[in-house]
Curated annotation (Swiss-Prot):
CC terms in the record's Gene Ontology section: lysosome; membrane
Subunit relationships: Heterodimer of an alpha and a beta subunit, produced by autocatalytic cleavage.
Glycosylation sites: 39, 108, 310, 334, 356
Enzyme category, top tier: hydrolase
Catalysed reactions listed for this entry: N-hexadecanoylethanolamine + H2O = ethanolamine + hexadecanoate; an N-(long-chain fatty acyl)ethanolamine + H2O = a long-chain fatty acid + ethanolamine; N-dodecanoylethanolamine + H2O = dodecanoate + ethanolamine; N-tetradecanoylethanolamine + H2O = tetradecanoate + ethanolamine
GO molecular function: fatty acid amide hydrolase activity; N-(long-chain-acyl)ethanolamine deacylase activity; N-acylsphingosine amidohydrolase activity
Keyword field: Autocatalytic cleavage, Fatty acid metabolism, Glycoprotein, Hydrolase, Lipid degradation, Lipid metabolism, Lysosome, Membrane, Signal, Zymogen
CDD domains found in the cross-reference section: Ntn_AC_NAAA (cd01903)
Provenance organism: Oryctolagus cuniculus
Pfam families assigned: CBAH (PF02275), NAAA-beta (PF15508)
Function summary: Degrades bioactive fatty acid amides to their corresponding acids, with the following preference: N-palmitoylethanolamine > N-myristoylethanolamine > N-stearoylethanolamine > N-oleoylethanolamine > N-linoleoylethanolamine > N-arachidonoylethanolamine.
Protein name: N-acylethanolamine-hydrolyzing acid amidase
Length: 358
């Protein structure tokens, strides 16, 4: 949502910001733990995740897989995937299925379970994403990822630097055992996050779309980070590629006005909403609802985020203040697994913090 552009007197601005941040509980980037950081080389075999997996308790990862599948996957889907796992493996795009198979072999999981847990994570990811431009034209991007099973997933959250030819090709935040990305950065090119767009009948749509060779949401995000050479190329790919489900893609670039929220249907874009600072639209806030519709009263994270951004002000926007905005309750809540702030023009400042670590 855009800034109002209304001037706020300095004292009132400070008081309002302090009130909005009162629910943060003193949370700062310095006092909040970050996840482990690993390198994954895309130049080696699909078993490339094994050096990372060796840092984790296999039983913890297996327990997470069992819990997510047990709670999130209907029995009819489980039976269908178990019967058709090998066929599905051939239909889905490389390198993802080969990576999943490599993980399954190491973790002693069936291929069906590996595929299902990766698909289950595509569902029920309630999130807040913000892309914003400061008064000097710098673009910042932040996101909270909210998800159940926090007691396990916080222990399995990692930052990953994906390497090509020994160099960092892109960076992302994910869970151990999950090959997709909901959050990532291509250095000096663009940043991207994904927020779920719940349209109902999710598993039916997913199964039908899979057999049409449509892409899982998080796999397209990772592929775009790997292959798109510019902000514009990323937006085009994310807007046009057929998907297994609806989603919001939030993209930030390196130049002024390079920021959009793409509202996706499975077959293409429903809406593309750009930054327009010259008209007062210096930030965009996307949760899990179409931006042109009112947020539901029972889950309005949008309005508190907008108030916090306006209280912060465009001139004071930074990665640190964006982190504070994402720490305002209920933008930050009991389901928040992690917060990431990033700016493609300053890729070394990519930062993830685990939330609710206790």
């Amino acid at each position: 949502m855009q800034g109002t552009g209304h001037p706020v007197r300095p004292v009132l601005e400070l008081l309002l910001l302090l009130l909005l941040l009162a629910g943060v509980g003193g949370s700062t980037t310095a006092s909040t733990p970050g996840p482990p950081l690993f390198n994954v080389s895309l130049d080696v075999a699909p078993e490339r995740w094994l050096p990372v997996l060796r840092h984790y308790d296999v039983e913890l990862v297996r327990a997470a897989v069992a819990q997510v599948i047990g709670d999130r996957v209907p029995k009819w889907v489980l039976a269908l995937i178990e019967k058709g796992a090998l066929k599905l493996e051939r239909l889905l795009p490389p390198p993802f299925t080969a990576e999943i198979r490599g993980m399954c072999d190491f973790l002693n999981l069936s291929l069906a379970d590996g595929l299902l847990v990766n698909l289950a994570y595509e569902y029920s990811a309630f999130c807040t994403s913000i892309v914003a431009q400061d008064s000097r034209g710098h673009v910042y991007h932040g996101r909270n990822l909210d998800y159940p099973y926090g007691s396990i997933l916080r222990k399995l959250t990692v930052d990953v630097q994906f390497l090509k030819n020994g160099q960092i090709a892109f960076t992302g935040t994910t869970f151990i055992g999950y090959v997709g990305l909901w959050t990532g950065q291509s250095p000096h090119k663009f940043t991207v996050s994904g927020d779920e767009r719940d349209r109902g009948w999710w598993w039916e749509n997913l199964v039908a779309a899979l057999f049409l060779r449509h892409s899982p949401i998080s796999w397209l995000l990772r592929t775009t980070l790997s292959e798109a050479e510019s902000f514009e190329a990323a937006v085009y790919r994310l807007a046009k590629t057929p998907l297994i489900a609806d989603v919001y893609y939030i993209v930030g670039g390196t130049n002024p006005r390079e920021g959009v929220v793409i509202t996706r249907n499975r077959d293409g874009p429903a809406d593309i909403w750009p930054l327009d600072p010259l008209k007062g639209v210096w930030f965009l806030v996307e949760t899990n609802y179409d931006h042109w519709k009112p947020a539901p009263e029972e889950d309005d994270r949008r309005t508190p985020a907008i108030k916090a951004l306006n209280a912060t002000g465009q001139a004071k926007l930074s990665l640190e203040t964006l982190f504070q905005v994402l720490s305002v309750v209920p933008v930050y809540n009991n389901y928040t697994i992690y917060t990431t702030v990033m700016s493609a023009a300053s890729p070394d400042k990519y930062m993830t913090r685990i939330r609710n670590p206790s």
